[in-house]
């Protein structure tokens, strides 16, 4: 599943062709993705202008010039394909096959500039909806979300309060979207390794100074990943078709049995399964 840096990269790729553009044609080729499309989906969007394309957690938000916001979630395998009028393809993809299969093309947007943006989703775990902009923050998808990890609201004081008295490990809590929005398995593993904090240590026993280091590590990892265009594992390319390359900077993720890259550490990266997810860490320097 794409994490915050990948979704932000997709947003950056789609923004130039969607922001300030009027949608002259919208086609819903099936009535549902993970959830049914809302009534009037095509009619409301046709003729609307996407004023701004934003991201909240792992959601893309198309702010319309009407009362609604177009909410899009990529799920496990959703991706966008951008086709310019001259036929040039600039795909922004989360994909499981090298070439799009037309049967997986579920939603098509066409702008007044003649650009066609097609949403493909083989697994159909992604979804789209229209939510009233005035009450967006109260919607169940957003009401319980914590602060954005790159915002000023996500700081050591916030995380210390979230960790206080908790017996769970910090990884479990950082993946809780109510504590911080948008973090996923890859970047939590990476940040904990940089901060040299064990993913299994009871969070309530982590000191304030170490939490300050962890917050800084989270922000650094995310900024670097966004600058690198995300991580290309098996299913991701940027909105211009180029591959993200942050995976080449991984210190822990998917590096089981390899040397830890932290300075002065001679440990070997291990892997444990927590709640069905692989946790990569160094048992030597992460305490």
From Swiss-Prot:
The record's section on Pfam families has: Fapy_DNA_glyco, H2TH, zf-FPG_IleRS
Names of the cofactor(s) = Zn(2+)
SMART domains with a match to the protein in the record: Fapy_DNA_glyco (SM00898), H2TH (SM01232)
One BP annotation, GO: base-excision repair
In which residues is DNA bound?
104, 123, 166
Example GO molecular function: damaged DNA binding
Which CDD domains does the protein's record reference? EcFpg-like_N
Q: Which domain of life is it from?
A: Bacteria
What does the record note about the cofactor?
Binds 1 zinc ion per subunit.
Q: Zn fingers (FPG-type): where?
A: 251-287
Among SUPFAM superfamilies, the record links this protein to: Glucocorticoid receptor-like (DNA-binding domain), N-terminal domain of MutM-like DNA repair proteins, S13-like H2TH domain
Instruction: Identify which residues the record assigns to the active site.
Output: 2 (schiff-base intermediate with dna), 3 (proton donor), 58 (proton donor), 277 (proton donor)
Q: What is its EC number?
A: 3.2.2.23, 4.2.99.18
Q: How does it assemble?
A: Monomer.
Describe the family membership recorded for this protein in Swiss-Prot or TrEMBL. Belongs to the FPG family.
Q: Which HAMAP family match?
A: Fapy_DNA_glycosyl
Name of this protein: Formamidopyrimidine-DNA glycosylase
């Amino acid at each position: 599943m794409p994490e915050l840096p990948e979704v932000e990269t997709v947003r950056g790729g789609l923004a130039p062709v969607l922001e300030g553009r009027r949608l002259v044609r919208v086609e819903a080729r099936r009535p549902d993705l993970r959830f049914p499309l809302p009534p009037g989906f095509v009619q409301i969007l046709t003729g609307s202008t996407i004023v701004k394309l934003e991201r909240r957690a792992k959601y893309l938000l198309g702010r319309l010039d009407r009362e609604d916001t177009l909410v899009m979630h990529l799920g496990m395998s959703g991706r966008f394909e951008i086709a310019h009028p001259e036929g040039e393809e600039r795909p922004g993809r989360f994909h499981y096959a090298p070439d799009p299969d037309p049967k997986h093309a579920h939603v098509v947007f066409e702008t007044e500039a003649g650009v066609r943006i097609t949403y493909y989703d083989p697994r159909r775990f992604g979804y789209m909806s229209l939510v009233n902009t005035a009450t967006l923050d109260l919607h169940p998808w957003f009401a319980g979300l914590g602060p954005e990890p790159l915002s000023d609201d996500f700081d050591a004081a916030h995380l210390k309060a979230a960790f206080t008295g908790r017996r769970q490990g910090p990884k479990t809590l950082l993946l809780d979207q109510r504590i911080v929005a948008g973090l996923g398995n890859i970047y939590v593993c990476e940040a904990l390794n940089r901060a040299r904090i064990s993913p299994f240590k009871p969070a309530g026993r982590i000191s304030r100074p170490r939490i300050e280091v962890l917050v800084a590590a989270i922000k650094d990892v995310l900024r670097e990943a966004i600058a690198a265009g995300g991580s290309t594992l098996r299913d991701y390319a940027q909105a211009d078709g180029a591959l993200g390359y942050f995976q080449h900077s991984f210190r822990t993720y998917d590096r089981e049995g390899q040397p830890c890259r932290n300075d002065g550490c001679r440990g070997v990266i291990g892997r444990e399964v927590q709640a069905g997810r692989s946790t990569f860490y160094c048992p030597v320097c992460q305490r």
